[in-house]
């Protein structure tokens, strides 16, 4: 397969936030203990007019701004999410139409818990690398839900990022050196049809689920590339909370300097399918030519996708062509628990 890489990327976040103290206060919990345990201080809250489709459209348009290509040249659009607005009606079609891609393209909505976005990137790599098309777009986005009073309510957040994959060397802002996946049947987190909120295995979501897959996915990628943590300038992992992310990074030998730009959960919460794509977007916003990035996603059920990426000198030309992830994080408005319940549709009669 020929060399492929990222030619454009973009991110989007709702402006609304809720602090852990407001959620904990509503349930009589110790906010400081929760913040220490999860390493999460606040999370994003989608407004009443925001969903996975609107977030994906904004992220995709910003990716197009950075890529500087004709959207009609994109041959595939994939949107990975746990929270597609419709059970039957593709989000990918909405995104493509809003971005001027349609009608000569293929599209699909993807699901694999929190790694559907990175699965889409792998699909785009294959389609572009095999010369089936010139460009392909993958989006990872979610407006995640947690049941009132559940531990997930402190982290389940909203946001997403889009990536346009191409192969023209002069257009690449980052190239893929390799990818690796590790997948099993592990029932750590699930939601059946017609259920409003997901269920999870509590502590079972840790060692036998998240850590097993992230660490094995990472080790498999390093073995394939014959590398160690010292060979990379940055890293990003799936982040259901800050504690898991930091633990995984340290177990693999990464330092805070390497993992800090990818870690957004303390200020954003867990954006599910958007978590790793958003973390990677923040790294790209800060990266320079020849920086090497190590990426590992995780999706419950369960699996991990890993990537080895090298940034090119074109990165400096495109960063300022769209709003950065850091600027989106800084643009925020806090809401209280009552407004949060209203915006998330949690008040049910």
Swiss-Prot record:
Gene Ontology molecular function terms on file: acetyl-CoA C-acetyltransferase activity; hydroxymethylglutaryl-CoA synthase activity
Catalysed conversion reaction: acetoacetyl-CoA + acetyl-CoA + H2O = (3S)-3-hydroxy-3-methylglutaryl-CoA + CoA + H(+)
GO terms (BP aspect): farnesyl diphosphate biosynthetic process, mevalonate pathway; isopentenyl diphosphate biosynthetic process, mevalonate pathway
Alphabetized InterPro entries for the sequence: ACP_syn_III_C, HMG_CoA_Synthase, Thiolase-like
Binding site for CoA: 203, 243
EC top class, as a word: transferase
EC numbers, comma separated: 2.3.3.10
Gene3D superfamilies noted in UniProt: 3.40.47.10
Subunit-level organization: Interacts with acetoacetyl-CoA thiolase that catalyzes the precedent step in the pathway and with a DUF35 protein. The acetoacetyl-CoA thiolase/HMG-CoA synthase complex channels the intermediate via a fused CoA-binding site, which allows for efficient coupling of the endergonic thiolase reaction with the exergonic HMGCS reaction.
PANTHER family: 3-HYDROXY-3-METHYLGLUTARYL COENZYME A SYNTHASE, HYDROXYMETHYLGLUTARYL-COA SYNTHASE
Similarity comment: Belongs to the thiolase-like superfamily. Archaeal HMG-CoA synthase family.
Function: Catalyzes the condensation of acetyl-CoA with acetoacetyl-CoA to form 3-hydroxy-3-methylglutaryl-CoA (HMG-CoA). Functions in the mevalonate (MVA) pathway leading to isopentenyl diphosphate (IPP), a key precursor for the biosynthesis of isoprenoid compounds that are building blocks of archaeal membrane lipids.
Protein name stated in the entry: Hydroxymethylglutaryl-CoA synthase
Lineage summary: Archaea, Methanobacteriati, Methanobacteriota, Methanomada group, Methanococci
């Amino acid at each position: 397969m020929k060399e492929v890489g990222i030619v454009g990327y973009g991110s989007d976040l709702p402006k609304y936030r809720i602090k852990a103290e407001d959620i904990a206060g509503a349930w009589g919990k110790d906010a400081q203990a929760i913040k220490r345990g999860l390493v999460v201080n606040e999370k994003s809250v989608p407004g009443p007019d925001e969903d996975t489709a609107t977030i994906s459209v904004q992220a995709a348009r910003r990716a197009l701004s950075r890529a500087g290509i004709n959207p009609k040249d994109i041959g595939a659009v994939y949107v990975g999410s746990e929270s597609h607005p419709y059970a039957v009606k593709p989000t990918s079609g909405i995104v493509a139409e809003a971005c001027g891609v349609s009608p000569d393209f293929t599209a699909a909505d993807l699901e694999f818990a929190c790694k559907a976005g990175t699965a889409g990137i792998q699909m785009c790599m294959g389609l572009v690398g095999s010369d089936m098309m010139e460009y392909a777009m993958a989006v990872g986005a979610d407006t995640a839900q947690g049941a009132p009073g559940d531990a997930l309510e402190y982290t389940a957040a909203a946001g997403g990022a889009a990536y346009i994959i191409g192969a023209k060397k002069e257009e690449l802002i980052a190239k893929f050196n390799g990818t690796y996946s590790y997948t099993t049947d592990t029932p750590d987190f699930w939601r059946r049809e017609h259920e409003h909120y997901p269920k999870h295995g509590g502590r079972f979501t840790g060692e036998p689920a998240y850590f097993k897959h992230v660490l094995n996915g990472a080790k498999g990628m390093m073995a394939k590339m014959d590398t160690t943590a010292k060979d990379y300038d940055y890293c990003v992992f799936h982040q259901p909370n800050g504690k898991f992310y930091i633990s995984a990074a340290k177990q693999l030998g990464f330092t805070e300097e390497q993992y800090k730009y990818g870690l957004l959960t303390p200020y954003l919460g867990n954006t599910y399918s958007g978590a790793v794509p958003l973390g990677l977007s923040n790294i790209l916003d800060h990266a320079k030519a020849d920086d090497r990035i190590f990426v590992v996603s995780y999706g419950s059920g369960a699996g991990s996708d890993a990537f080895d990426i090298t940034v090119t000198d074109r990165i400096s030309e495109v960063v300022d062509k769209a709003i950065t992830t850091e600027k989106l994080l800084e643009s925020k408005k806090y809401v209280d628990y009552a407004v949060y319940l209203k915006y998330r549709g949690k008040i049910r009669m």
